[in-house]
Amino acid sequence: MLIIPNRENLEQCVAFAKKHGLGFEYNDFFAPSLLDDAKRLEEVIQLYRQSGVPEYCTVHGAFFDVIPCSVDEKVKEISIQRIEASIEVAKRIGAKAVVFHTNYNPFLNSKEYVDKWVENNISFWSSELEKHSDIQIYLENMFDTTPDILEALSKSLCKYPNYGVCFDYAHAVISPTAPELWAKQLGRFVKHVHINDNDLVSDLHLAWGNGKINRKDFYALYEAYMPDASILIETSCIEDSKESFEQMKQEGFLTE
């Protein structure tokens, strides 16, 4: 189980993580402004290293407008720079994995476009997985309306031992496809899961139990299809992380 550390109350985050044996997923480094400020970037990396990096941690990579297979060469160039920078940060901080979004646009859905998109992304991510075989690279469903694209990618990329799917359950819930179908199609590829709550309409990142997601359904699907995957409580403040953690304990999903 992982939580998101917050620099504003880092000591509290570290204490809570140590008390319960939790890891961290660092969310600072997807910000373009930080990646572009070498001095500030180094300060943040050192802050986390000095605070005590948990034994298991991950980094959320850059995702704003990151399209590594764009037909626009300039967009492609900066996207690849962002991805490489994210991986470098993850390695420097001692993370076991780095998470990226598919960033697939579901409105471009002609067969020709989809086939080319899958082909190009398989080629790109295969290269990244080979180049960075010393770190896990996870692809997360974001704008995806079905698991089909991510499943197609995963069928080819799963031959790399450092590849996995990051299954964002809240994103799946607000998609037009039932969460059970997501779990069935992607389960065998899932190594990491993001959870938080919402109103079944928007991606609100509420504390677990403060929205309308059917939590029992999640527990059942997790146990059935991805029981070995790590889980991130993807909420932005330590209070919501604690509340979510306690909710899962009360419902018997977590034991200490």
Task: Give the residues covered by each predicted segment.
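Acidic-and-aromatic substrate-binding clefts and catalytic sites of carbohydrate-active enzymes
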Residues: 2-12, 28-43, 67-69, 106-108, ...
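Alpha-helix-loop-beta-strand connector modules within alpha/beta enzyme cores
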Residues: 44-64, 119-132, 215-222, 227
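N-terminal pre-domain/capping segments
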Residues: 1-85, 255-256
